[in-house]
């Protein structure tokens, strides 16, 4: 009897381990690490700020920002922040976006247009990294305004949040 209970408990423990490891595999890409300083009464306190894009290359993406005393901890904290800010976006069969879209954040504006299969990601800077980590393979994007990497990454995430599918539009207009 007790050996049966031990086997059952062992199976339960193993099933918990397996379920924890079956989370979706997320890809992290570093946009920028910068050394920042805080001026205090005792002098300057140096720390590092990391900007990281996290995604599963299948329609989920998030941007994370964090500061820490060393680069490794800043990167880890930025990864966890990116996981908290994950959004989902619709991707077409051609691995593109469904329609034209624009997003703003601060003084940055990002315009995205769907592209034909095989054209690749035509974008620059942080917008390219966000689109690649999101899993979009064929798109044309242009960033206008400020060249700030963090704000451009956030503007591209805002643009991707504005994407809708035909089903969502039909439901919104009550065209069922």
From Swiss-Prot:
GO biological process terms, semicolon-separated: translation
Keyword Magnesium: no
Record's subcellular location: Plastid, Chloroplast
rRNA-binding listed as a keyword: yes
Gene3D superfamilies (alphabetical): 3.30.160.20, 3.30.230.10
Recorded coiled-coil stretches: none
Span of domain S5 DRBM: 26-89
Listed Pfam families: Ribosomal_S5 (PF00333), Ribosomal_S5_C (PF03719)
GO MF annotations in UniProt: rRNA binding; structural constituent of ribosome
Superkingdom of the organism of origin: Eukaryota
Keywords: Chloroplast, Plastid, Ribonucleoprotein, Ribosomal protein, RNA-binding, rRNA-binding
UniProt-listed SUPFAM superfamilies: dsRNA-binding domain-like, Ribosomal protein S5 domain 2-like
Domain notes: The N-terminal domain interacts with the head of the 30S subunit; the C-terminal domain interacts with the body and contacts protein S4. The interaction surface between S4 and S5 is involved in control of translational fidelity.
Assembly: Part of the 30S ribosomal subunit. Contacts protein S4.
Protein name, per record: Small ribosomal subunit protein uS5c
